[in-house]
C-alpha cells in the first residue's frame, strides 16, 4: 500500500533585482552594502542604506524604497570610502511594493570591482 506525501516544496523566490538583472547580460552577482543618496535640486536629499546585488563594468543593480525615477542622479558610497561614485537611473522595475533599480556610473570608477 502506497501513501502519497503532501506538502509544499521550498521554492526560492527570485528577487526583483535578479529579475531586472536578466536585462543586463554582463551582470555579475555581488553583495556591496552602500549608502544611496538621491541628488535633488535646492539641497533636497533622500538617503537610504541598500545593497548592490549585481554589477556590470558600468552599472549597478539594487533594491530601493526611495521614490526614484528614470534619469535621477544618485550617489553611491560604501562605509570605507573606497566607493564614492555618481550614477544615473537607467531602468526601474516595480514588483510587489519593491523597486529594482539599475543605475549607470556617470564617470569611470577606477576601483570598481566588476571589470570588462
Question: What is the meaning of each model-derived region?
Answer:
Residues 1-116:
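Structured alpha-helical
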